[in-house]
Amino acid sequence: MGHDTLTKAGIFSATLLTLMLSNTAFAVEPNASSSESSSAKHSETVVAPYLREDAPTFNLTVAQFREKFNTTYPHMVLAEYKTIKTLEVKSPLIRAASRINNTLYSSVAIDKSQRTIRSLQLTYLPPPPSEEKPEKPENIAKAEKADRAVLANYMAAFISLFEPTSTLEKCQNKANELLEKGKGSPFYQQKEGTLRFVIADHNEKGITFAIEPIKLSLSDK
C-alpha cells in the first residue's frame, strides 16, 4: 500500500471517527429498567445518557486510566489520547481519541469541569475500499474477522479493569455476547450493577462499544 493510500485511509478514518463521536454515537435509548438488557432499532431519538448534565463519571482521569491499562496489559499499549476539536463550543464534554491500529480507535468523553471520564469507547472503522487494487471478497471477510477479534480483545480488557473480580475469560465471553446481541442495532445496552455496556452497530460504517458509570437510585442500593 503506497503512502498516498495510507494517507487517504488515515484521513478517512479520522474524519469518520470524528463524525461518529460528534453525532452522539448512542443517540437512541429505549425506556428500560436498569436490570434489563435492551436494544432499539426504531425508537425515538433522545439524548444519550452520558450527555446529560447529571451524568455520573468514573473516578478516573484519562491519564490514570491509560496508565492503569498499559500497566495491566503491556502487550496492548494505548497511545496518548489526543483532543478532538469539535464545533460543540458550549458542550460540557471534552472528546479525545487514541489510535490503536488502522481500524480501531479508543475514545473518551471527559467531563469538562471534573476532568474525569463519562464514557470510555472503542470504535472499529472498516478500511475504505482500495482505489488501486480492489481486494477479493474472501480476503476482505478474513481481514474483517481478524479486526473484529482485536476489537473483542480490547473490549474484554476494558471490561476487566472495571470488573476486577471477573476472569479475563469471562470478560472475553461478555465482549462476544455484547457484539452478538448488539449486532445490527444502533443502540444496545446491558446494565450490570454500576456499569452500562453499550453497542452501537452502524453496519458497514463501523461499531462502537462504550462502558459508562451508572448513577444508582436508592431502590438499586
Identify the residue ranges that each predicted region occupies.
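N-terminal leader/targeting segments
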Residues: 28-131
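Bacterial N-terminal signal peptides that target proteins for export
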Residues: 2-13
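Short, low-complexity, Pro/Ser/Thr/Gly-rich segments in the mature regions of secreted, periplasmic
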Residues: 204-221
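Long, charged/polar, surface-exposed segments that mediate recognition or autoinhibition
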Residues: 109-180
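Bacterial N-terminal signal peptides
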Residues: 13-22
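Sec/Tat signal peptide C-region and signal peptidase I cleavage site
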Residues: 23-27
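A cross-family detector of function-defining hotspots
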Residues: 73-110, 162-202
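Intrinsic-disorder-associated interaction segments
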Residues: 10, 40, 51-58, 62, ...
